[in-house]
């Protein structure tokens, strides 16, 4: 073990050899060589244990070097921590910027929807005009209401006044209410 600790190169070479022998043992296929399953299992166990042992020795070697650096040059640890923190800050700033961009997109979308709703002329409530199947926007919650159904009503219930679609004014009021609810749920900047 003293010879392994004297140079990191020898330990690195041993680690590489142990890894290669472990892979070789696991991947070789010699069904006609006369070896039985127990011998193969024993060889796999042996090479795997050697690989784990060399890996532990290498870990101890690097931990010793890290300890030496921390005692002889403590500013190096602080420098490493500062670098890690600055990388983390950059990552979080990029994430925040991404969220701000998405928020701006949603605000623009809501603004467009609100302007579109206010700029459309609304017929009087009692005009009796029915919406066509493609007219108007579907509610924000999902699928458009079926003919004869108001949004939020159970499928078997009839709306008052018969199986008519709600008036455009009613849809506009519902959409405005949904927009207000969404804008209340959005976190402030």
From Swiss-Prot:
Alphabetized GO MF terms: transcription coregulator activity
UniProt KW keywords: Activator, Coiled coil, Nucleus, Transcription, Transcription regulation
UniProt cross-references to InterPro entries, sorted A to Z: Mediator_Med28
GO CC, alphabetical: mediator complex; nucleus
Region (Disordered): 124-147
Main location class: nucleus
Cell membrane in keyword set: no
Main function: Component of the Mediator complex, a coactivator involved in the regulated transcription of nearly all RNA polymerase II-dependent genes. Mediator functions as a bridge to convey information from gene-specific regulatory proteins to the basal RNA polymerase II transcription machinery. Mediator is recruited to promoters by direct interactions with regulatory proteins and serves as a scaffold for the assembly of a functional preinitiation complex with RNA polymerase II and the general transcription factors.
Similarity comment: family membership: Belongs to the Mediator complex subunit 28 family.
Protein name: Mediator of RNA polymerase II transcription subunit 28
